[in-house]
Amino acid sequence: MALWIYVVPPLAGLVIGYFTNDIAIKMLFRPYRAYRIFGWRIPFTPGLIPQNQPRLAKQIAKTIMGSLLTPEELHNLARKLLRTERMQAGIRWLLGVALDRLQNPEQQQQTAQVLARILADLFNESLPRLVKVLARQETFLEGPINQLFDQVLLELRLNAEQARQLSEWILKQALPPKVLRQNLVDFLTDRNIEALDEEFRERATGSYWLVANLFGLKNALLRLRTYCLEEPEGAEAILEDLLKDINAPRRLTEILQNLSLQNLPVSAVRQLRRALRDGIQDYLRSQGPEVIKGLGESIDWEKVASLVLGRLRNSKALIASIDQISADLALILERYLERDLESLMMQVIPVLNLDQVIADKVNATSPAELEQAIQQIVRQELQAIVNLGGLLGFLVGCVQVLFLLR
């Protein structure tokens, strides 16, 4: 009997200390929900952590944002993630994905439609507005127009074949005998006939003076006009024979072939260039936006986009330039981030709302999952607390036995 007095207290202290700590640790998480009897909530239900999970979530978020994810740490993390090599690799990957997308006919069609809408908006909307704004400047297109005049129009000369074709077109389409006859009739008005007769009388000399003052040109010109009006077919035949007799096609061909702006005086060339520039500028100011918009509406932009994408898909220069393009873009981003990364991170942190994200994530975690996660992290530490409780209980029992021995 005396033996039980010395054995029971240490064993009882061991059992009580061990299981008391084990129960206390389990009561941190369990029960997971509240239990009620006749509407009265049983104390210690739910467990401490499930009962205070919202406050715990806010405290965890506050601790993480205050100690771990500070703006300085996020800034340093962003600099590590956005190193030039990583950005270049990411940009190269994106460009590779874009090129691979062009190889797929269905995706190429979708890309062509998107590109067509972009080109149409650029040409039909943005470009007319840009021309309208730029046209207000006095020097609008002055350099390109002058360059066009100096390098193209000033050097332009027709070769023999071009001059021959142009002369044939002029004589057959622009100035056939019928048109010449009508122009001659329109020119020979009474006023013009009087002016020609007076000019001939004043300027004629020698034998021509005698003819001019005795006969004059008035009657002859009146008869010519009357003949052209009353006998149009005969007048046209005479004009046609006259053109053949003077070999008009050959003469006109020679004139056109020798025609060049370089043969004109310098002052005339400058005046012509100025007039051309002013005419183009005035036309673009008044009609340019409408002309560009109308031209854009007449273009099949989807077809143009398909041609552009097809050319890009088979472009060896583009494929060979991917590395260089990605490197250049990465350097541009690096320079931008070096200057504005800190301010950018200060703007991003409130937008990300990381503390609320962390709190919502903790609140969304079930008590069982939360217990399992904590147990995985501190399982050994929690078991050590349980064992320590048993050890302390055993020691208390031993102390009690010592008191009994005294």
Curated annotation (Swiss-Prot):
It comes from the Bacteria. GO terms for cellular component: plasma membrane. The keyword Cell membrane applies. It is found in: Cell inner membrane. Signal peptide: none annotated. It is a multi-pass membrane protein. The chain crosses the membrane at residues 1-21, 385-405. Keywords: Cell inner membrane, Cell membrane, Membrane, Transmembrane, Transmembrane helix. Belongs to the UPF0754 family. PANTHER family: UPF0754 MEMBRANE PROTEIN YHEB. This is UPF0754 membrane protein CYA_0973. It comes from Synechococcus sp. (strain JA-3-3Ab).
